[in-house]
Amino acid sequence: MKCVEVYKELYHQEPFDVAFCPYRISPLGAHIDHQYGKINGLAIDKGIHMAYHPKQNGVVELQSLNFPKRAQFFVSAVPDEKQGDWADHLRGAAKMLGEKYRLKVGLSGIIEGSLPIGGLSSSASVIICFLSALCKVNGIHLEPMEMILTAKAAENQYVGVSCGKLDQSCEVLSKKNHLLYLDTKDDSYELIPTSEKMKPYKVAIFFSGLERSLKNSKYNLRQDECKAAAYALMGYAGMDYDTFANTRLRDVPFEVFEAYKERLPELWRRRAEHYYSEFARAEKGAELWRKGDLEGYGQLVFESGKSSIYSYECGCDELKKLYEIMTDTDGIYGGRFSGAGFKGRCMALIDPDKAEDIEVKVTTEYLKAFPALNGKYSFHFCESADGVEL
């Protein structure tokens, strides 16, 4: 790992340890975790590594191999306001952890992401990787749900991204060769083993060549549109409702949506249509995975991608082109945008025997459409993996 070599060169010592947090994919359940929907997810064998060593003076000193500028702050005196750089995720993590535990020991470290930024929950991976190291040097043990909620709070309350808990849950709870089936309303989950009847598969990652940050996207706006739809539907139906901030589409039965959907503004109706259809796909997908029906599962993933484009209305021209190519490529069982879907990448479940042909076809057609991205676009094969070690 390059982070280890850079650490040794910079600090003239071996790192104390190397923390790792996997990236994740979510084939089904896209854009509904923040509405307390159900999701399907997998951790993959690519992610964030951090070579580090404790600092007894309480200073956190971190450098990223993916971003400029070294981060430095006292673990017990994190700035109250974000600084607007990549290290806000680290400051937020320390801030949230420090609200529950006394932090005395800092650390020096080098952080390295194994894939380009965007669409694989890299921000959540950075936070969880850092939290696991910070906990270790301070003698703190977090249970899985506590790690998930601490990492989520760092993004929500400090970075300013209104994410749900899909990313963190996949990265913490996942198990190799299993599908995580999670209800984000009550945090109940099931790890569904890959059936012996299921055909072999690999995860393919198509990086568009465009990196993105949720802070400047329409990610938060889409959530507000979902909440607005829920709030209006509850009002039309005469239901009891809470504040706008505490309202979710999960609070609204599908029958209420069907009865009053024509009264919603078109954009709000589309967002709600995506929520209800994606919720159903996540439920059906779990059953198909249990049965080993990879073709049927893949078709649901393609349907999810279509709904993200036309009902949730995310995606840029480049991601839409990748999706279009995937739907017409032999050997791809199913694919869609990965992550928020405003830039970043697409993911697919593929037939391993056709991996080389898939790589050639997708790459050729994509770069024919966007030649300026030659050298930035990339293709990666991954396997399912265990979640972070706590």
Residue ranges: model-predicted function:
Residues 1-28, 49-83, 178-334, 349-390:
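C-terminal nucleotide
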Residues 125-127, 345-350:
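FabD-like malonyl-/acyl-CoA
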Residues 342:
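Glycine-rich phosphate-binding loop
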Residues 1-19, 25-38, 74-77, 83-195, ...:
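Gly/Ser-rich oxyanion-binding loop with an adjacent helix/lid
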Residues 40-43, 51-54, 101:
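Short, charge-rich binding segments
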Residues 36-43, 222-223:
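Short Gly/aromatic-enriched secondary-structure transition segments
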